[in-house]
Structure formats: structure tokens, C-alpha cells
Design a protein with these regions (language model features):
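Flexible coil segments in periplasmic/lumen-exposed cytochrome c-class electron-transfer proteins
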Residues: 1-46, 88-145
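Sequence/structural segment immediately N-terminal to covalent heme-attachment motifs in c-type
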Residues: 29-57, 64-82
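A cross-kingdom feature marking solvent-exposed beta-strand/loop segments within repeated
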Residues: 58-68, 87-88, 95-97
Length: 145
């Protein structure tokens, strides 16, 4: 595939509107939100920033992403488990890579992290459960050692 095609696909996917079944974000006092916030600060905020805004042309904004709060969290789970390679841009000719966290986070931690991301910065989405993460991890055959 040509680079222009890859960039067009990436742009399209980033612009898909959210399809959330939740009507209001979880409270910041919710235990899963607190646990997820701590993990986010430790592992994600350096690139995606505390406000979820990311860094233009380098690290995507989670706050502006419709797919973050989509009804089905499997794509988001996959990215966090396996990491992702960004397309090349003029600002980053090699294209930054998000590391895989599947080896580092257990199912409960990953569920808390994604629940936090899906309910922050104006998003309102159903919480991600340990079972959903476990099933996705199994389907993706990610080694946890």
C-alpha cells in the first residue's frame, strides 16, 4: 500500500464518531477510575499528556478520538496490548511507535486504564471489564510473561 493510502485510512479511522452506550462519564471517585488514572499517569501521560491532548503530528489525542469511547473496546484493547506503529510524517519520518503493555499490565489493570481513558476528557463510555480484556487477550494470543 502507498504511504498516501495508509495516511488516508488512518485519518478516516480517527474521524469515526463514537458509538457509546453510556450517557455520562463515570465519577472520578469510582475505584476503577482512580486506579486507571494512576496507571495512565505512569504509562501514558508522557506521550498523550495529562489532558489527553497528545502531541500534534507525533502522539494522537485521546481526548479528540471518537474511537476511544466506541461501543466495542476491542480495538483499543488491542492497541494497548500489542502497541501500534504510527505512519510517517514530516515531523516524524520514522513514525513513532507506541509500546506494547500486554506484558506489563494484568487484565484488571488494563480494564481500569481503559475505563479511565474511555470516561475522561468529555468521553462517556461503558467500563471495560476484566473479562472483556481476558477474552481479547486470549483471541490475540498475547503472551503475558
Amino acid at each position: 500500500m502507498k504511504q498516501d493510502d495508509l495516511e488516508a485510512i488512518a485519518t478516516y479511522l480517527k474521524d469515526i464518531p463514537a458509538e457509546s452506550a453510556a450517557t455520562a462519564p463515570l465519577s472520578a471517585d469510582d475505584p476503577s477510575m482512580q486506579a486507571g488514572a494512576a496507571i495512565y499517569r505512569d504509562l501514558c501521560a508522557a506521550c498523550h499528556k495529562l489532558d489527553g491532548a497528545g502531541v500534534a503530528a507525533l502522539f494522537p489525542s485521546l481526548a479528540a478520538s471518537g474511537s476511544v469511547a466506541s461501543r466495542e473496546p476491542t480495538s483499543l484493547i488491542r492497541v494497548v496490548l500489542r502497541g501500534a506503529q504510527s505512519v510517517s510524517t514530516s515531523a516524524a519520518p520514522i513514525g513513532p511507535r507506541m509500546p506494547a503493555f500486554g506484558w506489563q499490565l494484568n487484565d484488571a489493570e488494563l480494564a481500569a486504564l481503559l475505563t479511565y481513558i474511555r470516561n475522561s476528557w468529555g468521553h462517556a463510555a461503558m467500563p471495560v471489564t476484566e473479562r472483556t480484556v481476558r477474552n481479547a487477550r486470549s483471541r490475540l494470543a498475547v503472551r503475558n510473561d
